[in-house]
Amino acid sequence: MEHIADNLKTFIVNSSSEERILYTKEFKWIGYTKAKIILDKMVDLTTYPKGHRMPNLLLVGESNNGKTALLKKFCRSHQSYVDEKTAKLKCPVLMIQSPPEPDEKRFYNAILNSVLAPTKTSEKIENRQNRVIHLLKELEVKVLIIDEIHHVLAGTISKQRLFLNVIKYLSNELNIPLVCSGTKLAFNAIQTDSQLSNRFEPNILVRWENNTDYKRLLASFEKVLPIKKRSNLIEDKLSNKILLMSDGLIGEISKILELSTILAINTTSEKITLDILNEIDYIAPQNRKKAFFNNGIY
């Protein structure tokens, strides 16, 4: 089992099929070059000196192409802690999800809920804003992450402008970098405010292509799949098939390998083959709408 990471070999030998299947379903972070570059940039933001104009980062990618997983990886590396000298809670990185539509009150509530602070329905919006600013300063938040920022576009033009002004005001008051993330619509959302757009550096997670980085990604995946035989995922027929099925989205690649690993365990073949890939219960992203039409749903 030379294809398996050393810390996984003992687990595979001593575990039942059910235990290995359960392990397969657990999320595993698979690093890759572009993710490392973006993570390094975000780490740099946590130590950036406070100044007149703080740098911001905009993470753009298609749905299921690794944006949220990357952000959560960053958050896990910068968890809240209690300062031993002051006995106060510190939260260097705070991540929230943008509300489904641009709404100032719901935005503040998302922040308050994330730090387990109470929310009051009757509280005036300016008081809520002041409380958010006070709490984030007390927690010494270094970077604020707003995921699904493209939700801004779900509102009217006036609501979009108001919401973006709220974000801009919060950033100015706290004097900290922002990281916003979303689909390609996120870029359009930020571009509606010229001042904000100039502050954000866009970083794009593109679809995977059949190149060295993609083969390296598959090799990394194979090291954490709890099956006993080498599948050699980087072999052309397998790698091409996985890329075609996944439509180049890392979330889909992960799901395909999860389903294939489970089938390989259940059939005792203990390796991923073309037959296994053809047998898994999976519909490629580009074929899902077609499947609805074919089944008379539309």
Predicted regions and their residues:
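C-terminal alpha-helical "lid" subdomain
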Residues: 1-17, 64, 211-212, 219-298
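Conserved P-loop NTPase "ATPase switch" module shared by AAA+ and STAND
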Residues: 135-158
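Pre-Walker A adenine-sensing motif
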Residues: 39-51
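Post-Walker A helix-loop "phosphate-sensing" segment adjacent to the P-loop in P-loop NTPases
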Residues: 76-87, 117
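The catalytic "switch" region of P-loop NTPases
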Residues: 153-155, 165-233, 237
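Walker A/P-loop nucleotide-binding motif
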Residues: 51-73
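Dynamic helix-loop-helix/coil hinge segments at AAA+ ATPase domain boundaries and subdomain interfaces
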Residues: 20-38
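Conserved NTP-binding/hydrolysis module of P-loop NTPases
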Residues: 93-94, 99-120
